[in-house]
Amino acid sequence: MNNIKLPVLYCPFPSAINQHCEAAYQHTLEWVRSFNLLEELACQKLFAANFHGLMARVYPNASLKALEILTDFMYLGTIVDDAYEKAGTSKQPDLLEPEQARLLNILKGAELTDVDTPVALAWGDFVQRLHQFPYVTSEWMLYFVKHMEDYFQAARWEALNYSQGIMPDLVTYIKMRPLVFGIYPFFDMILIADGIALPPEVIECPAVKQMGLAANNAMAWANDIFSFKRDIKEGMVHNLLLVLEHEYQISLEEALKRAVELYEAEVQNFIELSLQLPSFEAGIDTNLERYVLALRFWMSGYLDWIMKSRRYGKFSEYQLL
């Protein structure tokens, strides 16, 4: 495994970094500490993963106010996601549902209480601030809530698999991975970060949804390609390479080759779909073009970040060509 060489993944999209990256980082670091979400050593380890750098790359045009809440959301989501993985590997997946239900109720308007956890209190602060953005309409909230519900349900599925030692088959994994990955709520945030107004007929357009799925899949496969070493070390079975290896009884090297092919196919699919989108009307088409550009920044920014993040090991450890 140590000698496996990963190729440089294909991504023909522009890259940029938000000028407010450092300020957003300082804000979120204090925000996480203010809610006592982590012990100090765990906090330092988490921020070493540079998720603030990820947010600055995938939302390069966001204002400072927007980037702050996006970075808060990213770090809080990571804390929650790591807790869900731990619940699964410690064979306690039933712990997830009550907390998830509480977070969803807060998102839908429930008041905070004295018995809420630090995560719930931080989430409540996030939700309150979220409503201050003009593009957070009732329609937008419906999509955001639905995508959070989908993520929570998928996280329970993943945790149950971990607790029971279940390796999903390839078809099931490909179906569930976009939901477990948790990117759709961040795609919703593009409208906040870039000030884009898209009516429901555009958001629900099959071609637009397929384009979003292609972007989601490409990043999920990139994640699995770069994280397989950590996943093997930690006993995680939810990884495309490991699923391919198990499904087809092939070597890890061959699984890597097939995973890269799946990644490249999704990038090409995204390109083709983005060039074949239907026309709506002038103003809407302009905003849709901006949305496509934002997805391109997501794909390139995510790849830039994951190649450098300490969360998955140093770039040099993988001996990239």
What do these predicted ranges mean?
Residues 1-321:
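Alpha-helical, largely C-terminal catalytic domains
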